Amino acid sequence: MLPVNPRDLEKMMRRLGIKVEQLSADEARIVLGSGETMVFRSPTVIVMRAKGQPPMVYLVGDYTVEKPREETAAEITEEDVALVAEQAGVSMEEARKALEESGGDIAEAILRLKGEE
């Protein structure tokens, strides 16, 4: 590659209508379609703008990939099941199923069961 003077490069880009801006950032995150997140720590962020084109953003630096957090299932206790069964007047199995469907929300489970009667 030929050595290029940074000043000359800047002049050439200006003539072409390209503006370059460097930003400082502590962290940059990109959320991927798979749910994973690329985390750049102390990246160099370069924004290039050309006339009539959307800006191009370059992230330069090391990154890590974070896996998506798995939602933990709501903990359903026997006391919750008994309360729902008593309030809705249904069996323990029906009460447990309603609690699982409502994500452990007791009030929602009772309302669902009373609405089904």
UniProtKB/Swiss-Prot annotation:
Lineage: superkingdom: Archaea
Keyword tags: Protein transport, RNA-binding, Transport
Keyword Membrane: no
Annotated ranges, domain NAC-A/B: 3-72
GO biological process assignments: protein transport
Gene3D superfamilies: DNA helicase RuvA subunit, C-terminal domain, Nascent polypeptide-associated complex domain
InterPro entries reported for this sequence: NAC-like_UBA, NAC_A/B_dom_sf, NAC_arc, Nas_poly-pep-assoc_cplx_dom, UBA-like_sf
GO molecular function, one term: RNA binding
Family that this chain belongs to: Belongs to the NAC-alpha family.
Subunit structure, interactors included: Homodimer. Interacts with the ribosome. Binds ribosomal RNA.
Function: Contacts the emerging nascent chain on the ribosome.
NCBIfam families: archaeal-type nascent polypeptide-associated complex protein (TIGR00264)
Protein name according to UniProt: Nascent polypeptide-associated complex protein
Organism from which the protein derives: Aeropyrum pernix (strain ATCC 700893 / DSM 11879 / JCM 9820 / NBRC 100138 / K1)
